[in-house]
């Protein structure tokens, strides 16, 4: 029996994208050139963030954020049980422990009503995932955690997403976006960190 592979999503590209790629190639400036700085500036502006830092992937961005927040062995990080494995991997990269919380059956985002029971004296951060571009219930999430717990948005799928009049990427202490081909915008691979915390941005 023949089987047909069904893609999660296909990137939409055309003449505009070709010209955008062609310009830096023809200039000879393929990495860390003026186009990167321009992209960071425009991405920050679009999401109303004070700082945007281009990275190689959303995973790299999440890892950088956790390192900048100085997470390490003995620390715990709360995250949803339904997410891409990278969300948990970056916690392990830092030597910290991922603590999983079940998700809502309607949104597939982390269930705020189940967070408080997973908070301990070792909890240093929470990583809400804005799954499939739908922002997690950030108000309820923040109400469920102590004030000292850092909020790191896994906004891999959430470029341009909005939550109660605020943009994804500005709903916590920092966020990381993905530009993988199945995301709403793509650079082939790549990612972006956003934050309104100047000191944190400089540390990264």
Regions found by a protein language model. Give the residues of each.
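N-terminal "arm"/small-domain region of PLP-dependent enzymes with the aminotransferase-like
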Residues: 1-30, 34
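Conserved active-site segment immediately N-terminal to the catalytic lysine
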Residues: 150-186
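Phosphate-binding glycine-rich loop
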Residues: 29-76, 87-94, 100-102, 166
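PLP-dependent aminotransferase-like
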Residues: 67-155, 162
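Conserved core segment of the aminotransferase class I/II
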Residues: 181, 185-204
């Amino acid at each position: 029996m023949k089987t047909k592979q069904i893609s999660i999503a296909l990137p939409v590209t055309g003449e505009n994208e070709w010209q955008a790629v062609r310009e830096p190639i023809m200039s000879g400036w393929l990495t860390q050139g003026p186009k990167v700085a321009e992209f960071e500036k425009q991405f920050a502006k679009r999401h109303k963030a004070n700082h945007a830092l281009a990275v190689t992937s959303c995973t790299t961005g999440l890892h950088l954020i956790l390192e900048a927040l100085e997470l390490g062995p003995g620390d715990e990080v709360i995250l949803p049980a339904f997410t891409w494995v990278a969300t948990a991997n970056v916690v392990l990269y830092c030597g910290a422990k991922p603590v999983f919380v079940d998700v809502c059956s309607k949104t597939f985002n982390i269930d705020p009503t189940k967070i408080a029971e997973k908070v301990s004296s070792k909890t240093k951060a929470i990583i809400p995932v804005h799954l499939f571009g739908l922002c997690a219930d950030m108000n309820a999430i923040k109400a469920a955690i102590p004030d000292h717990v850092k909020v790191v948005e896994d906004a891999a799928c959430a470029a341009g997403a909005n939550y109660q009049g605020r943009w994804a990427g500005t709903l916590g202490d920092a966020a990381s976006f993905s530009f993988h081909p199945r995301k709403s915008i793509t650079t082939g691979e790549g990612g972006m960190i956003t934050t309104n915390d100047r000191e944190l941005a400089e540390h990264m």
